[in-house]
UniProtKB/Swiss-Prot annotation:
The lineage of its organism: Eukaryota, Metazoa, Chordata, Craniata, Vertebrata. May be involved in the regulation of spermatogenesis and sperm maturation. This is Leucine-rich repeat-containing protein 18. Its main location: cytoplasm. InterPro entries: Leu-rich_rpt (IPR001611), Leu-rich_rpt_typical-subtyp (IPR003591), LRR_dom_sf (IPR032675), LRR_domain-containing (IPR050216), LRR_R13L4/SHOC2-like (IPR055414). GO terms for biological process: intracellular signal transduction.
Amino acid sequence: MVKGEKGPKGKKITLKVARNCIKITFDGKKRLDLSKMGITTFPKCILRLSDMDELDLSRNLIRKIPDSISKFQNLRWLDLHSNYIDKLPESIGQMTSLLYLNVSNNRLTSNGLPVELKQLKNIRAVNLGLNHLDSVPTTLGALKELHEVGLHDNLLNNIPVSISKLPKLKKLNIKRNPFPKPGESEIFIDSIRRLENLYVVEEKDLCAACLRKCQNARDNLNRIKNMATTTPRKTIFPNLISPNSMAKDSWEDWRIRLTSS
Protein backbone atom coordinates (compact mmCIF):
# COMPACT_ATOMS: atom_id res chain seq x y z
CA MET A 1 0.00 0.00 0.00
CA VAL A 2 1.37 3.43 -1.02
CA LYS A 3 2.11 5.72 1.89
CA GLY A 4 -0.91 7.88 2.62
CA GLU A 5 -3.26 5.77 0.50
CA LYS A 6 -6.61 5.08 2.11
CA GLY A 7 -8.38 1.77 2.22
CA PRO A 8 -11.40 1.16 0.00
CA LYS A 9 -13.85 2.04 2.74
CA GLY A 10 -11.58 3.96 5.06
CA LYS A 11 -13.15 6.47 7.37
CA LYS A 12 -11.43 9.69 8.33
CA ILE A 13 -11.13 9.84 12.08
CA THR A 14 -11.27 13.37 13.41
CA LEU A 15 -10.98 14.38 17.04
CA LYS A 16 -14.74 14.99 17.07
CA VAL A 17 -15.45 11.52 15.70
CA ALA A 18 -13.08 9.97 18.23
CA ARG A 19 -14.67 11.79 21.16
CA ASN A 20 -18.06 10.46 20.10
CA CYS A 21 -16.62 6.93 20.31
CA ILE A 22 -15.66 7.18 23.98
CA LYS A 23 -17.56 4.78 26.21
CA ILE A 24 -17.61 4.23 29.95
CA THR A 25 -17.06 0.63 31.02
CA PHE A 26 -19.02 -1.11 33.77
CA ASP A 27 -16.21 -0.36 36.22
CA GLY A 28 -16.05 3.33 35.32
CA LYS A 29 -13.07 3.25 32.95
CA LYS A 30 -12.89 5.29 29.73
CA ARG A 31 -12.74 3.22 26.55
CA LEU A 32 -12.08 4.64 23.09
CA ASP A 33 -13.78 2.21 20.70
CA LEU A 34 -12.68 2.67 17.08
CA SER A 35 -13.20 -0.94 16.02
CA LYS A 36 -14.67 -1.93 12.64
CA MET A 37 -14.30 1.53 11.10
CA GLY A 38 -12.14 0.72 8.07
CA ILE A 39 -9.20 2.71 9.45
CA THR A 40 -6.03 2.27 7.37
CA THR A 41 -3.57 4.37 9.36
CA PHE A 42 -3.27 5.05 13.07
CA PRO A 43 -5.25 8.28 13.67
CA LYS A 44 -2.83 10.77 15.21
CA CYS A 45 -5.67 12.90 16.55
CA ILE A 46 -6.45 10.31 19.23
CA LEU A 47 -3.15 11.12 20.93
CA ARG A 48 -5.02 14.11 22.36
CA LEU A 49 -7.17 11.57 24.20
CA SER A 50 -4.22 9.93 25.90
CA ASP A 51 -6.00 9.77 29.24
CA MET A 52 -8.02 6.76 28.02
CA ASP A 53 -7.93 3.56 30.06
CA GLU A 54 -8.83 1.30 27.15
CA LEU A 55 -8.26 1.52 23.39
CA ASP A 56 -9.94 -0.69 20.79
CA LEU A 57 -8.63 -0.46 17.22
CA SER A 58 -9.54 -4.03 16.31
CA ARG A 59 -10.97 -5.19 12.98
CA ASN A 60 -9.53 -2.39 10.88
CA LEU A 61 -6.93 -2.19 8.09
CA ILE A 62 -4.04 -0.77 10.12
CA ARG A 63 -0.53 -1.81 9.07
CA LYS A 64 1.67 0.13 11.46
CA ILE A 65 1.45 1.23 15.08
CA PRO A 66 3.58 4.35 15.71
CA ASP A 67 5.96 4.86 18.62
CA SER A 68 3.70 7.66 19.79
CA ILE A 69 1.19 5.10 21.10
CA SER A 70 3.28 5.13 24.28
CA LYS A 71 1.63 8.47 25.13
CA PHE A 72 -1.30 6.40 26.39
CA GLN A 73 0.37 5.99 29.77
CA ASN A 74 -2.87 5.12 31.58
CA LEU A 75 -3.85 2.42 29.12
CA ARG A 76 -4.64 -0.90 30.80
CA TRP A 77 -6.39 -2.57 27.83
CA LEU A 78 -5.21 -2.49 24.20
CA ASP A 79 -7.01 -4.42 21.47
CA LEU A 80 -5.41 -4.45 18.00
CA HIS A 81 -6.66 -7.80 16.75
CA SER A 82 -7.63 -8.39 13.11
CA ASN A 83 -5.49 -5.80 11.37
CA TYR A 84 -2.41 -6.07 9.10
CA ILE A 85 0.25 -5.27 11.68
CA ASP A 86 3.62 -6.98 11.13
CA LYS A 87 5.60 -5.24 13.86
CA LEU A 88 5.00 -3.71 17.28
CA PRO A 89 6.86 -0.52 18.20
CA GLU A 90 9.65 -0.63 20.77
CA SER A 91 7.86 2.08 22.72
CA ILE A 92 5.15 -0.39 23.73
CA GLY A 93 7.46 -1.34 26.59
CA GLN A 94 6.80 2.08 28.12
CA MET A 95 3.09 1.30 28.55
CA THR A 96 3.63 -0.27 31.93
CA SER A 97 -0.01 0.06 33.01
CA LEU A 98 -1.11 -2.48 30.40
CA LEU A 99 -2.98 -5.48 31.79
CA TYR A 100 -4.41 -6.84 28.54
CA LEU A 101 -2.90 -6.91 25.04
CA ASN A 102 -4.60 -8.53 22.06
CA VAL A 103 -2.70 -8.52 18.76
CA SER A 104 -4.13 -11.76 17.38
CA ASN A 105 -5.00 -12.22 13.71
CA ASN A 106 -2.33 -9.92 12.33
CA ARG A 107 0.89 -10.51 10.36
CA LEU A 108 3.33 -10.52 13.24
CA THR A 109 6.54 -12.52 12.97
CA SER A 110 8.90 -13.33 15.80
CA ASN A 111 11.19 -10.51 14.63
CA GLY A 112 8.27 -8.12 14.87
CA LEU A 113 8.00 -8.51 18.64
CA PRO A 114 10.39 -6.12 20.40
CA VAL A 115 12.40 -7.17 23.44
CA GLU A 116 10.86 -4.19 25.21
CA LEU A 117 7.77 -6.32 25.80
CA LYS A 118 9.54 -7.64 28.89
CA GLN A 119 9.02 -4.23 30.51
CA LEU A 120 5.25 -4.85 30.76
CA LYS A 121 5.60 -6.14 34.30
CA ASN A 122 1.91 -5.81 35.16
CA ILE A 123 0.42 -7.45 32.10
CA ARG A 124 -1.92 -10.39 32.78
CA ALA A 125 -3.18 -11.49 29.37
CA VAL A 126 -1.48 -11.55 25.96
CA ASN A 127 -3.02 -12.95 22.79
CA LEU A 128 -0.56 -13.55 19.95
CA GLY A 129 -2.64 -16.16 18.16
CA LEU A 130 -3.28 -16.28 14.40
CA ASN A 131 0.01 -14.71 13.40
CA HIS A 132 3.24 -15.93 11.75
CA LEU A 133 5.38 -16.62 14.82
CA ASP A 134 7.94 -19.40 14.35
CA SER A 135 9.30 -19.06 17.87
CA VAL A 136 8.00 -17.89 21.23
CA PRO A 137 9.57 -14.62 22.33
CA THR A 138 11.75 -15.24 25.38
CA THR A 139 10.44 -11.97 26.77
CA LEU A 140 7.20 -13.71 27.75
CA GLY A 141 9.08 -15.70 30.36
CA ALA A 142 9.91 -12.45 32.17
CA LEU A 143 6.27 -11.43 32.59
CA LYS A 144 5.55 -12.96 35.99
CA GLU A 145 2.01 -11.57 36.27
CA LEU A 146 0.76 -13.37 33.16
CA HIS A 147 -2.42 -15.37 33.71
CA GLU A 148 -3.36 -16.07 30.09
CA VAL A 149 -1.28 -16.51 26.92
CA GLY A 150 -2.62 -17.16 23.43
CA LEU A 151 -0.15 -18.64 20.91
CA HIS A 152 -2.58 -20.68 18.83
CA ASP A 153 -2.52 -20.89 15.02
CA ASN A 154 1.11 -19.90 14.50
CA LEU A 155 4.20 -21.69 13.11
CA LEU A 156 5.65 -22.85 16.43
CA ASN A 157 7.52 -26.14 16.73
CA ASN A 158 8.45 -25.83 20.39
CA ILE A 159 7.57 -23.93 23.55
CA PRO A 160 10.32 -22.72 25.91
CA VAL A 161 10.28 -24.15 29.41
CA SER A 162 10.25 -20.63 30.82
CA ILE A 163 6.60 -20.33 29.79
CA SER A 164 5.56 -23.32 31.90
CA LYS A 165 7.35 -21.78 34.88
CA LEU A 166 5.32 -18.58 34.86
CA PRO A 167 4.02 -18.60 38.44
CA LYS A 168 0.51 -17.27 37.77
CA LEU A 169 -0.23 -18.81 34.39
CA LYS A 170 -3.73 -20.31 34.32
CA LYS A 171 -4.52 -20.61 30.63
CA LEU A 172 -2.29 -21.33 27.66
CA ASN A 173 -3.61 -21.85 24.13
CA ILE A 174 -1.05 -23.42 21.78
CA LYS A 175 -3.46 -25.30 19.52
CA ARG A 176 -2.88 -25.73 15.79
CA ASN A 177 0.88 -25.29 15.69
CA PRO A 178 3.21 -27.65 13.75
CA PHE A 179 4.79 -29.39 16.74
CA PRO A 180 7.11 -32.16 15.45
CA LYS A 181 6.09 -34.75 18.05
CA PRO A 182 2.47 -35.89 18.38
CA GLY A 183 1.05 -34.95 21.74
CA GLU A 184 3.85 -32.50 22.57
CA SER A 185 1.40 -29.70 23.24
CA GLU A 186 -0.63 -31.89 25.60
CA ILE A 187 2.48 -32.91 27.55
CA PHE A 188 3.50 -29.28 27.86
CA ILE A 189 0.08 -28.22 29.08
CA ASP A 190 0.09 -31.01 31.68
CA SER A 191 3.17 -29.41 33.26
CA ILE A 192 1.19 -26.24 33.98
CA ARG A 193 -1.13 -25.69 36.89
CA ARG A 194 -4.72 -26.23 35.83
CA LEU A 195 -7.24 -23.45 35.42
CA GLU A 196 -8.75 -22.63 38.80
CA ASN A 197 -11.63 -20.35 37.80
CA LEU A 198 -14.57 -21.71 35.83
CA TYR A 199 -17.35 -19.51 34.53
CA VAL A 200 -21.06 -20.25 34.25
CA VAL A 201 -23.45 -19.59 31.41
CA GLU A 202 -27.04 -20.74 31.08
CA GLU A 203 -28.15 -23.11 28.33
CA LYS A 204 -30.48 -20.43 26.97
CA ASP A 205 -27.43 -18.26 26.20
CA LEU A 206 -25.80 -20.88 23.98
CA CYS A 207 -26.23 -21.19 20.24
CA ALA A 208 -27.67 -24.51 19.03
CA ALA A 209 -24.30 -25.79 17.76
CA CYS A 210 -22.52 -25.01 21.05
CA LEU A 211 -25.29 -26.65 23.05
CA ARG A 212 -25.10 -29.83 20.96
CA LYS A 213 -21.33 -29.90 21.40
CA CYS A 214 -21.70 -29.64 25.16
CA GLN A 215 -24.34 -32.31 25.32
CA ASN A 216 -22.18 -34.68 23.26
CA ALA A 217 -19.20 -34.01 25.53
CA ARG A 218 -21.37 -34.67 28.58
CA ASP A 219 -22.61 -37.96 27.08
CA ASN A 220 -19.04 -39.07 26.34
CA LEU A 221 -17.98 -38.33 29.91
CA ASN A 222 -20.89 -40.33 31.23
CA ARG A 223 -20.02 -43.32 29.04
CA ILE A 224 -16.41 -43.27 30.23
CA LYS A 225 -17.56 -43.05 33.83
CA ASN A 226 -19.94 -45.98 33.39
CA MET A 227 -17.19 -48.13 31.87
CA ALA A 228 -14.94 -47.49 34.88
CA THR A 229 -17.36 -48.80 37.48
CA THR A 230 -19.86 -51.61 37.76
CA THR A 231 -21.98 -49.72 40.24
CA PRO A 232 -24.66 -47.51 38.72
CA ARG A 233 -23.78 -43.94 39.41
CA LYS A 234 -25.62 -40.68 39.14
CA THR A 235 -24.97 -38.82 35.88
CA ILE A 236 -21.88 -36.67 36.23
CA PHE A 237 -21.74 -33.07 35.10
CA PRO A 238 -25.47 -32.85 34.26
CA ASN A 239 -25.10 -29.33 32.98
CA LEU A 240 -21.75 -29.45 31.20
CA ILE A 241 -21.70 -26.70 28.64
CA SER A 242 -19.08 -25.59 26.16
CA PRO A 243 -17.57 -22.30 24.98
CA ASN A 244 -20.10 -19.55 24.42
CA SER A 245 -19.47 -17.15 21.57
CA MET A 246 -21.17 -14.37 23.54
CA ALA A 247 -18.59 -14.46 26.33
CA LYS A 248 -15.72 -13.15 24.21
CA ASP A 249 -13.60 -11.97 27.14
CA SER A 250 -13.19 -15.50 28.48
CA TRP A 251 -10.72 -16.54 25.75
CA GLU A 252 -12.91 -19.60 24.99
CA ASP A 253 -12.63 -21.17 28.42
CA TRP A 254 -14.92 -24.11 29.13
CA ARG A 255 -17.78 -23.27 31.44
CA ILE A 256 -18.97 -25.95 33.82
CA ARG A 257 -21.91 -25.68 36.17
CA LEU A 258 -22.34 -28.27 38.90
CA THR A 259 -25.79 -28.48 40.39
CA SER A 260 -27.14 -30.66 43.11
CA SER A 261 -30.48 -32.39 42.75
